[in-house]
Swiss-Prot record:
It comes from Bacillus licheniformis (strain ATCC 14580 / DSM 13 / JCM 2505 / CCUG 7422 / NBRC 12200 / NCIMB 9375 / NCTC 10341 / NRRL NRS-1264 / Gibson 46). Signal peptide: none annotated. HAMAP family: Ribosomal_uL10 (MF_00362). Belongs to the universal ribosomal protein uL10 family. It comes from the Bacteria. One of its GO terms (molecular function) is large ribosomal subunit rRNA binding. This is Large ribosomal subunit protein uL10.
Length: 166
């Protein structure tokens, strides 16, 4: 076999493993973005621990078939870039959605969220969710509210008894 075919097989395996290992994968059309904008997008994604790569559609299609992600091939037309995140489900959706709001040339096409092919609407809905840390802080404040109310009520009763005793 030629070395070109071997190289392509390695790339397909790489894409397949990233599709399977990532918690969140988003496909975007980057047509119309200039070099400075793409560089800025890559920087923002890197800061969020998201890998952003451009692959040939034919190789991506083969990887999608190997990863058994039916329905994703429909979105693999034109120039595409793929954002992979193995840590945070929300991070790539959030960064790409914010960037797409500022730069209309970036178009979110589809995504794979925890192994399930997702539409643009689902990706955008995911982007609107708070981060894991934000959700945890909300949960913590909800859990602390009854304790705080009990402490305030106890303090009020103590002050009331103090006034009656004085």
């Amino acid at each position: 076999m030629s070395s070109a075919i071997e190289t392509k097989k390695v790339v397909v395996e790489e894409i397949t493993s990233k599709l399977k290992e990532s918690k969140s994968t988003i496909i975007v059309d980057y047509r119309g973005l200039n070099v400075a904008e793409v560089t800025e997008l890559r920087k923002q994604l890197r800061e969020a621990n998201v890998e952003f790569k451009v692959y040939k559609n034919t190789m991506t299609r083969r990887a999608v078939e190997q990863a058994e992600l039916d329905g994703l091939n429909d979105f693999l037309t034109g120039p595409n870039a793929i954002a992979f995140s193995t840590e945070d489900v929300v991070a790539p959706a959030k960064v790409l959605n914010e960037f797409a709001k500022k730069h209309e040339a970036l178009e979110i096409k589809a995504g794979v969220i925890e192994g399930k092919v997702s539409t643009v609407e689902e990706v955008k809905a995911l982007a609107e969710l708070p981060s894991r840390e934000g959700l945890l802080s909300m949960l913590l404040s909800v859990l602390q509210a009854p304790v705080r109310n009990l402490a305030l009520a106890t303090k009020a009763v103590a002050e009331q008894k103090e006034e009656q005793g004085a």
